[in-house]
From Swiss-Prot:
Sorted UniProt keywords: Hydrolase, Lyase, NAD, Nucleotide-binding
Region Arginine dihydrolase, annotated ranges: 10-269
SUPFAM superfamilies (alphabetical): DHS-like NAD/FAD-binding domain (SSF52467), Pentein (SSF55909)
Ligand binding (L-arginine): 22, 71, 90, 139, 168, 170, 258, 264
Cofactor: binding comment: Required for ornithine cyclodeaminase activity.
Oligomeric form and interacting partners: Homotetramer.
Lineage: Bacteria, Bacillati, Cyanobacteriota, Cyanophyceae, Synechococcales
Family to which the UniProt record says this protein belongs: In the N-terminal section; belongs to the DDAH family. In the C-terminal section; belongs to the AgrE/ArgZ ornithine cyclodeaminase family.
Disulfide bond residue pairs: none
Protein's name in the database: Bifunctional arginine dihydrolase/ornithine cyclodeaminase ArgZ
Site (Key determinant for dihydrolase activity): 71
Positions annotated to bind L-ornithine: 22, 71, 90, 139, 168, 258, 264
Lyase in keyword set: yes
Length: 705
């Protein structure tokens, strides 16, 4: 027996499943056998007594879960951090455990009343005493970890639980002697699994399969080379034996009904202390402020969910609800993260939702100077599509050239900020790093949920369940907006792929160009080639556009077209020479509509007009979309995503594709101001032209007054 190891237990005199506070209790209320529970507890008690000293705390009537002493607190040396139970059903246990600790000479530390921490159920010392593994996500809060590190003077490693079946750390994680670890990886998020793998070498990690995990194999008591646990598989026993451990199985089925096993029924009150281990915690906290229709537009819920989904924790410090229907609300929220890296990721996404630091916190953003052309500092802030302001010389400065996936370069005299692509960074540029001192300016979503309505519409169409009537309704709205934009002198840009030509949409797109609904055309080599092929030879990719069947030798048509245009020197020259007499490119030339054809590695030819320098093509695209009010994206995922990344917030984007994944992909890239239409692009253009023709009178602002 190990005389230096003491374990606290509590007899199950009043044990029963009286309520449901975890998934294991569901369906088991009052279905536990008191007789079998006592029998199983006594067997566990006897098994532990053979290898350690067992102390007992007297059970209190009315608190059936007091038998699970692992949740009494966390002990190191003469100090104990008392538990703050998450559920009211267990909060009455706290004074009984506190009394026992004080009677036995421990110094008791108590967390704030509203900060849950459930003791050694969510905090497990490395068996070598090197650090403390601390769980959070269901019962314990991340913000409790700095207190624990301070009071127990130890390093705390935070792990986030994501499977509600494993609501406490000790249900899926068991540090073993010799630096080994018994655990169930799917119970943790990706970041926590990386942390575990960085701390524990592969040969020391013993992974538990789900069959053993749900039988609480990880909820085991380890005393030196002995592991006391519920019944487990032969495979797991062999793994443990290979690592040098002796497994002692004892059935604990009655306690599984309440979501506990061997470890839950025990609390080790003698933990190893290393003199060179001191308080260390990587947790970082920041306060953010949000304003707007936080509740009815779902902004606050979205922000809080974002924090949790990214391994963080939060506490709402202050919330002021708007008193009128049109009033805005405000909130101050403290956000905590297990590391600086995670905090930066969370803050980057919160900024996109309009979160800002309290005004008194920051005067200037952090910057680093570029030392190598075309290379940003490691921690540079990546811009988004939303209008952005940054703090320069203690004032908010509007960022110019707003677009996605760029760095922000600032100057102090005069104060300015602009988005710059990585390749355009110059030595000496001051680039913003981190996420402090930045905010996005987003339009306030009304209580009517205007933006949300569009998002729902987008999701409905992208789900692939739209009817033809639904498409027609969307086309009517799009046509009306296009008419307004044209008649008010606005700008509409079209990004189109060759499918427009293949589906018979060339005549309709030509009509839009001719009638002044297109002010710039973006695409690739293919749309121009097949448009000219259709205009001059009546085929597209060798298919007769009238009969819909391939023609003999049609597979060579596009190469003949490329060769002919190259002979003339370009598309404009071919139009002027009369070789091209109709089609999309013809109308662009005749109506002086600028276009850019961006090349790719698969292009045949290419046409002389095709820009094969990708950097120059991107720059030209960016120039042509400046000042756009609407962008039509017609069956070209690659070009559409590229354009979406260059487009600032506020520009209406209409994505048309037969594949729902394309419009979803566009949304995932951050192009949230989008309307998705899942339909054949040729049909869409036909409906659009018909609807525009029905709007016979020019839109006039005067007529509405």
């Amino acid at each position: 027996m190990a005389d230096d190891i003491r374990i606290l237990m509590c007899p199950p005199d009043h044990y029963d499943v009286d309520y449901v506070i975890n998934p294991w209790m569901e369906g088991n209320i009052h279905k536990s056998s008191q007789e079998r529970a006592v029998e199983q507890w006594k067997k566990l008690h006897q098994t532990i007594k053979e290898c350690a000293i067992v102390d007992l705390v007297k059970p209190a009537k009315g608190w059936p879960d007091m038998v699970f002493t692992a949740n009494a607190g966390l002990v190191l040396g003469e100090n104990v951090v008392l538990s703050r139970f998450y559920h009211k059903e267990r909060q009455g246990e706290e004074p009984y455990f506190k009394a026992w600790f004080e009677e036995n000479g421990f110094t008791v530390y108590e967390l704030p009343q509203d900060l849950p921490f459930e003791g050694a159920g969510d905090a497990l010392f490395d068996r070598e005493g090197r650090w403390l593994w601390a769980g959070y996500g269901f019962r314990s809060e991340l913000d409790s970890h700095p207190y624990i590190a301070k009071w127990l003077d130890t390093e705390v490693v935070s792990l986030r639980l994501i499977d509600e079946r494993f609501y406490h750390l000790d249900t899926c994680f068991c540090p073993l002697s010799g630096g080994y670890l018994l655990y169930y990886p799917p119970a943790f998020d990706a970041y926590s699994n990386r942390v575990i793998e960085m701390r524990i070498p592969p040969e020391k990690r013993i992974i538990v399969e789900e069959l053993d995990a749900v039988n609480f194999a990880c909820n085991a008591v380890n005393v030196n080379d002995i592991i006391i646990m519920n019944l487990v598989s032969r495979t797991l026993k062999e793994k443990l034996a290979e690592a040098g451990f002796k497994v002692r199985e004892t059935p604990l089925t009655e306690f599984l009904k309440a979501g506990g096993a061997a470890k839950c029924l025990t609390l080790r009150v003698t933990e190893p202390i290393l003199p060179d281990v001191h308080a260390t915690v990587s947790i970082e906290s920041r306060v953010i402020r949000m304003e707007g229709h936080l509740l009815d537009a779902g902004i606050l819920n979205q922000a809080l969910d974002l924090v949790v989904e990214n391994s963080g924790s939060f506490r709402v410090l202050n919330f002021n609800l708007g008193v009128e229907r049109n009033s805005t609300s405000s909130a101050e929220v403290r956000v905590s993260a297990p590391s600086h890296q995670i905090m930066e990721e969370i803050m980057t996404e919160l900024i996109d939702l309009g979160a800002v630091p309290p005004p008194q916190e920051l005067c200037d953003i952090n910057t680093e100077t570029v030392t190598q052309g075309g290379v940003a500092p490691d921690d540079f802030y990546v811009s988004t599509i939303y209008p952005t302001e940054v703090r320069v010389n203690c004032e908010w400065v509007q960022v110019t050239g707003q677009r996605m996936d760029a760095a922000i370069v600032v100057t102090s005299n005069p104060p300015s900020a602009r988005c710059v692509l990585l390749r355009d960074l110059q030595v000496g540029d001051r680039v913003m790093v981190g996420v402090e001192g930045i905010r996005t300016i987003k339009k306030v979503e009304s209580h009517e949920g205007g933006t949300r309505k569009e998002n729902k519409e987008f999701a409905f169409m992208a789900a692939g369940v739209s009817s033809e009537r639904r498409v027609e309704l969307l086309v009517e709205q799009i046509a009306w907006e296009m008419r307004q934009i044209r008649d008010q002198g606005g700008k509409i840009v079209v990004t189109a792929g060759p499918v427009v030509i293949h589906t018979g949409g060339a005549q309709h797109l030509s009509h839009l160009v001719r009638e002044g609904y297109v002010h710039a055309l973006l695409g690739g080599n293919a749309i121009a080639v097949h448009d000219i092929e259709q205009a001059t030879m009546g085929t597209s990719l060798g298919v007769d556009m009238q009969r819909g069947i391939p023609v003999r030798g049609g597979h060579r048509h596009h190469l003949k077209i490329i060769n002919s245009v190259r002979r003339y020197g370009g598309i404009r020259q071919a139009v002027e020479a009369g070789f091209i007499s109709k089609g999309v490119m013809y109308e662009c030339v005749k109506n002086n509509i600028p276009y850019c054809l961006a090349g790719s590695i698969r292009d045949d030819g290419p046409l002389p007009d095709t820009e094969m320098n990708l950097v120059r093509a991107q720059s030209r695209y960016s120039e042509l979309i400046q000042g756009a009010d609407m962008i039509l994206m017609l069956s070209s995922m690659l070009h559409s995503i590229g354009v979406g990344n260059m487009t600032p917030s506020g520009v209406k984007m209409v994505c048309v594709d037969i594949n729902p994944a394309v419009v979803t992909k566009l949304s995932d890239r951050g192009s949230v101001e989008s309307v998705g239409v899942v339909t054949d692009v040729g049909l869409f253009l036909s409906l659009l032209v018909r609807q525009l023709q029905q709007l016979t009178r020019p839109y006039s602002l005067a007529e509405t007054l």
